[in-house]
A protein has these predicted regions:
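Rossmann-like S-adenosyl-L-methionine
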Residues: 1-193
Length: 193
């Protein structure tokens, strides 16, 4: 895809399959996927490490895409909930959970701000929230809803240090503090983060 919102398969399947962190993933257009599989496994391993799961937690994963982080965390959590705005990605996430025999995952399609607000008003109190937003970072209302849910930990996967810094500052206003950070070079040999 270069530009546009219509996709046409010219040859072969209209999706890709990949194995990541021991799980099989289906990826349809226009879903996001980390192109550097080896470093993605390092990144997701760090997310799992920072989440510090024991098997009894509920995890909310905002901006879950096709469920890569959500399903990687599902192996170590009691319940995982993924949210994503791209309908084909959510369809793939649900399929990926079934494909990998993961039964403790559920997925919602919609804007992260709307879903976070709805889950918070419904009384969801996750132990851990993971976020992996696009370069623009988190909207203030997403941060407010996450903070209102009161998770013990927020694991923030960022591709833009500037928006990460901005969002950490806002989280601080809600009583959170940054405790750990790790850099993963997703694009070795380039200036990209």
């Amino acid at each position: 895809m270069v530009l546009g919102d219509k996709y046409r398969t010219l040859f072969g399947r209209n999706y890709l399959m990949d194995t990541l962190c021991g799980l099989e993933f289906k990826l349809s257009m226009p879903s996001f996927y980390q192109v550097n599989r080896d470093q993605a496994e390092v990144l997701y391993g760090k997310a799992l490490e920072f989440a510090g799961l024991t098997g009894n937690e509920t995890v909310l994963d905002l901006y879950c895409g096709i469920g890569t982080i959500t399903l990687c965390l599902a192996k170590a959590a009691k319940r995982v909930i993924g949210a994503e705005i791209v309908p084909p990605a959510i369809r793939d996430a649900k399929e990926n959970a079934l494909r990998n025999h993961i039964e403790n995952a559920e997925f919602f399609c919609g804007d992260a701000a709307d879903i976070a607000a709805k889950l918070e008003s419904d009384g969801l109190r996750p132990d851990v929230v993971t976020v992996d937003p696009p370069r623009k970072g988190l909207a203030p209302e997403v941060i407010a809803s996450v903070a209102a849910m009161g998770p013990e930990k927020v694991v923030y996967v960022s591709c833009d240090p500037a928006t990460l810094g901005r969002d950490v500052k806002i989280f601080r206003e809600f009583g959170y503090e940054a405790k750990r950070a790790a850099a993963v070079d997703m694009f070795p040999g380039t200036a990209h983060v």
